[in-house]
Amino acid sequence: MCIRDRILVEEKINSRLASKVELVQKMTKYHLKTGGKRLRALLTLQCAKICEYQKGLRDVNLAACVELIHAATLMHDDVIDSADIRRGKKTLNTIWGNHSSILVGDYLLSKCFEMMVEDGNLELLKLLATTSSEIAQGEVLQLQHNKEIDILEETYLNTVSYTHLRAHETLSH
């Protein structure tokens, strides 16, 4: 992803996260400042280029959506894992609490789906919705089996499949 593309993705994310609710605004800005490599955006932009999905800023919108889904899952994971630090900074749940963190993660997901509805590609919207659903199911599987030392290989592979592979599969569509 060239610098121009990264800037476009960042601008799209920032513009879509504007909120009249001050706490939502603070939390999303804080989370975005923690950085990240934007690898998912890079992969999305490359796949969009290969699939010729670049009319207007459709590729940038899709890359922003993928990043928003990722950010939301990180917020939810930090609550589930009681994480205090992510990327060298305090997590949202450490600063603002679990309830706010979950709700802001949900806010990011809703913003992603708003963008995809505006795009009008129902097939892609369905794919992102299915991916989000399967990520959530994978997290529940992980939570359900996290205390089991003798976790079955099949259960572990199902969990990984839901939480990671489905997200990567989305990028290749």
Model-derived regions, located:
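Conserved small/polar residues in nucleotide/adenosyl-binding loops
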Residues: 1-5, 163-170
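Conserved N-terminal diphosphate/IPP-binding helix and adjacent helical/loop segment
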Residues: 3-69, 75, 79-94, 130, ...
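All-alpha helical catalytic cores of prenyl diphosphate-utilizing isoprenoid enzymes
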Residues: 14-18, 33-37, 103, 117-167
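Hydrophobic alpha-helical core bundles mediating ligand binding, dimerization, or RNAP-core interactions
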Residues: 28, 108-109, 160
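Residue-level signal for inorganic ion chemistry
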Residues: 43, 112, 138
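Signal-transmission/dimerization alpha-helices at domain junctions
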Residues: 69, 114-115
